[in-house]
């Protein structure tokens, strides 16, 4: 084997053995690697289990057994081994530093291969780093931007990457290079894009830009031109890669090769619609990076920068409601849950920027097949853009001197009453409360967090703190989720004894696996509500997690007496009795749970565990099958394996049931 083909990582070595059919050798290698790294313990355990299954199959072969299903079982074992190897790869790759080609080399290669998306992506990712570029790298970038063979979308993407780079690490030399691109002797398109980038950097690094000698005279012009240029910047950033990708995809859909599998007209249109709604992440990765910058993550700016389109905004909703025959694709685009709001915004901009001839071609091709595709552009795009920009600048208040930026474009045809709740000037407690309640009802959790936090500075009430916690717990921001527990603890200190607060505080501790604190909170809640069956059930569950099974059963029986037939109490009782080995009583309660309408998959898995404890394998398999997903049942047994052994179930019985489920899973496929 040549040196360059020699496998270097554990995954490559395992994969080579699996390809050659050396299952035993591959499993041994996985086990050895997992034994050396404690973080791979769970993968090692699964490898040992797989090894035992393989040994058992070899024993059958050694006895001369010629079961035709042995080959199927071998294929299943091989598939499991591949999944195990992939898990090992996923666990090890993040710990290794990827090889990165120097940016100077990438730029030189880009001049030779201007249409290479791969090179462009690598340059974009490396420019996202905060380090300053060397003189040679800046020179190579200069050559790439001025090269006549570089397509416009590549130039726009490079400038977008430079913008991202400068927002994170101010580089005076790079900024001055940008200024040279704005001079009259440069191509018009490059002048415009460079000005846009310069304005964007100026808004973030105001205190640095105004002291650069070459830019001092232009600084006032930059400030005055910011609204229009920032508008162009967003279009450029969102379109630079997205339009090109759209173009390739559309041509593939419309001008399909006869050699490829022919799609029906309906499938073509459906594919086109799905493509629009799924979003183009390559362009918008810049916006994701910008969220890390303090300027854009500030409470007053982050919402409108990254969520410009939302059905709850009165102006956007009004556009769609104006015309009862609103465009199907635009409505679907706005209502799509698969796309973030900025993706939707970028898709609108891209479609608006499309060449009329291309739009006519799309319409003509689809009409030939009897499909109408009229009115491709969304209604009143300028109205949409005007409202978005008005809210953006009014909300961000980004003028260097602290004055709200105004522009004639923002003033035309605006119904200010629709946007009162968005105004940055809202400070009266009554107005804040109405705004917060509106955002809470519309489930705009990030904005609700900010508004409730502001409201607490004026007045501290139990309801406000509870709603702040609820908004934080539903927010996509991880920092808000971390603060949610602290907010709830503070609420409990200021307003002790509230059942809602104590219940949610206990749930938060349970999710964090802080069972001791959860127990303390539940005991406090029971002092105020001694006979509440829900609190008793939660306390029983908490005690079970702490291995205080006898106390848990006593509490759960008390809860069952308080509210006869409560489903969750019966489920927890069945689980606790199962752990004590009391199969008869556990079976009684699990039957009550499974007799209810639509029991969950977890209920059937627990029922299967209890049946196994009673050595009733057919009943256990019947219950596992009722999860309607053999993989889910198999994983449930695998994750509960220690629990099953602790409950007195023999390991060979567990293994047998898992093998039977795997066999049925394979037959089902």
Located regions from the model:
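Alpha-solenoid helical-repeat scaffolds
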Residues: 311-500, 504-507
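Structural motif corresponding to the intra-repeat A-B loop/turn of tetratricopeptide repeats
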Residues: 20, 442, 475-479, 512, ...
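Start-of-helix register in tetratricopeptide repeats
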Residues: 8, 193, 430, 463-467, ...
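Canonical positions in the second alpha-helix
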Residues: 455, 490-491, 524-525, 558-559, ...
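Short coil turns that delineate tetratricopeptide repeat
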Residues: 38, 460, 496, 530, ...
